[in-house]
Amino acid sequence: MALAVWSERVLELLLKMNNLQHAGCLPFCVQGQRVGWVTQPVAQVLLQSSDIFTLYKEDSGARLELSDRLRTPHQRTRAVQEVMEALRGRGAFPCLQEWSDELYDVKTFFSDPPLLSVERAATPLLGVSRRTVNVNGFLRRGSKIFMWIARRSLTKPNYPGMLDHLAAGGISAGSGVWETVLKECEEEACIPESLASKARPAGTVSYAYEKDDALYLECEFVFDLEVPESFQPHPGDGEVQEFYLWPLDKVRDAIVTQEFEPNCALAVLDFLIRNGHIQPDE
């Protein structure tokens, strides 16, 4: 792929994944703490659907607040879950059709205790940050680096059949970062813990975009895992069809196509930059 074309497509990817404008969005608060953002159309539906949401208007601006009568994380989780299940049944928002039966913790800061937990598919409606782990699996052949790429199962509710990391997944409620790394490596690619434990933290990649009145905010904890030449990943939990071992030139071209899952493409782009495969002028 010509450099000029590739650079233009990278810019398109970055703009697509970072198009969130807070103007017009309402802070979503729990116990007086802002934990997310809600668009006006979503706020209107939530207010009409349940009295657990209240709109407050003050001189400093408006906000959407979860009811204070829900005093515990369990009560908040159950109440919000009931609302989201009802909205899903009505076909109210496209994101709810990706229902996963997986809860994500909602916190003010990552190190804080959770205020509640929310179904993964519903997090964009409340604009709460999702946190994931993304594992770059790679090996070296002389001076060249090759990367393991997964193709997602066609039965996945989101991004079916698209290209992905060797292993990646959301940090579900009650789970930790390292725990999730080991879990996703074993479940998605049958990587034994003896090898997965060699993954090294490489930083974080964050993005925020708006789609269909929903706000997608995510922080990816990125890990690099160098594997031996003899290593061969295998699909484990049915979320992956197959794996490919590609040179970085091919990976570089793939991440700017419609075939690559865009949020994972960002973490791979980060890997390419950190390993000197993309130069500053590119």
For each predicted feature, which ranges?
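N-terminal leader/linker segments that precede catalytic domains of diphosphate-processing enzymes
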Residues: 1-162, 170-186, 191-240, 248-260, ...
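Short aromatic/basic micro-patch
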Residues: 245
